[in-house]
């Protein structure tokens, strides 16, 4: 049995979007599950819309997701000689022909067919020409599609789909300027690269019978096809920019872990029992094309956010720290200027929904608060709480065993002496050291900050209260 080989073949006309990333993931998983190869091909024949910037964004998105490829990236613009060679071969064998019909004639034909409630299709006028009409311009090249019979596609997702050749027209495989068309290049590339399984959106299904006929005209069996349903927004319409972030790298910038995005993408059309959270290894071992749903999936941002929280919570702190460092760097924070990043992660894993949230809540570990959150300050930094801050400062200044347990005892002792509930002491301390009302448990927070920074910040808060009171 031939080694399984799948491919992802984006057009570099924009970013790596959610739908494309899901297609790449499904192709990658199937190859990895079966010990095969995954190929990356850049379909850049549309020279007007293709940009190097888009190529870079696609490659960056693939890298961030961890979807490594065994071959490529291949570029179609580097293969024009091969397309010309096979176009000529089809012409020589009578399997393609030159079409001289003008745009005006084709437009009129289309209008007439639509007026007669017929399916618009080329009528084959040039099919049997032996020489160019007088005054004709440069021709396009059309594939001579069979006129009768059927094309049967055994689709791994949709099952058997049957197309009648009589309903297919003679598609253009090369434009008048000689550039090849999508339907031709994709067949040639998949043939030359030995692609065995093609996973793609079901909007390509109508191209499939034409491509199958092209494969056979070129003397090869077509690959196995798996057409996956589209992704819808919550309003039931096809997912687009109006539904929010659709670029993979936007989710990176918003603080999502790549494995959380992959987990969400795999669940957009595939399931395994009632399991929701999957590691990448689990996805590889469980995924199969036959298990993909037949109906469209709805993109739910809240579900993605929940999965991100689950992955942050379950990951090793060192793994999360790698990605958190990027977000801290974006905020001009050097993690070397504070407590170990892994410890900062471990203290916040249970609560953080995104790495952006974790980064924002981690800033005070690396630099003194520039000011206090107004509402938290009004409630917790006032003359009535100054005694608690002074007591905690004095107890902590004498503490040599700077561990969470010992710190907790100091805060507890201050509360007992002042006959206050623990929160009435801990919260002013929290606002004093962090600048806001939210942090990990106060003993963990102070342990991570260290003795010097803790005492300095508590004293700064005491001084701030005195200045406010003095007017």
From Swiss-Prot:
SUPFAM superfamilies: An anticodon-binding domain of class I aminoacyl-tRNA synthetases, Nucleotidylyl transferase
UniProt xrefs under Gene3D superfamilies: 1.10.10.350, HUPs (3.40.50.620)
Cofactor annotation: Zn(2+)
EC assignment: 6.1.1.17
InterPro entries: aa-tRNA-synth_I_cd-bd (IPR045462), aa-tRNA-synth_I_codon-bd_sub2 (IPR020751), aa-tRNA-synth_I_CS (IPR001412), aa_tRNA-synth_I_cd-bd_sf (IPR008925), Glu-tRNA-ligase_bac/mito (IPR004527), Glu/Gln-tRNA-synth (IPR000924), Glu/Gln-tRNA-synth_Ib_cat-dom (IPR020058), GluQ/Sye (IPR049940)
Keywords assigned: Aminoacyl-tRNA synthetase, ATP-binding, Cytoplasm, Ligase, Metal-binding, Nucleotide-binding, Protein biosynthesis, Zinc
Record has Iron as a keyword: no
Cofactor note: Binds 1 zinc ion per subunit.
Gene Ontology biological-process entries: glutamyl-tRNA aminoacylation
GO molecular function terms noted in the UniProt entry: ATP binding; glutamate-tRNA ligase activity; tRNA binding; zinc ion binding
Catalytic activity: tRNA(Glu) + L-glutamate + ATP = L-glutamyl-tRNA(Glu) + AMP + diphosphate
Positions bound to ATP: 241
Main location: cytoplasm
Enzyme class, first EC level, given as a word: ligase
NCBIfam families in the record: gltX_bact
Similarity comment text for this entry: Belongs to the class-I aminoacyl-tRNA synthetase family. Glutamate--tRNA ligase type 1 subfamily.
Entry function: Catalyzes the attachment of glutamate to tRNA(Glu) in a two-step reaction: glutamate is first activated by ATP to form Glu-AMP and then transferred to the acceptor end of tRNA(Glu).
Name assigned to this protein: Glutamate--tRNA ligase 1
Encoding gene (name): gltX1
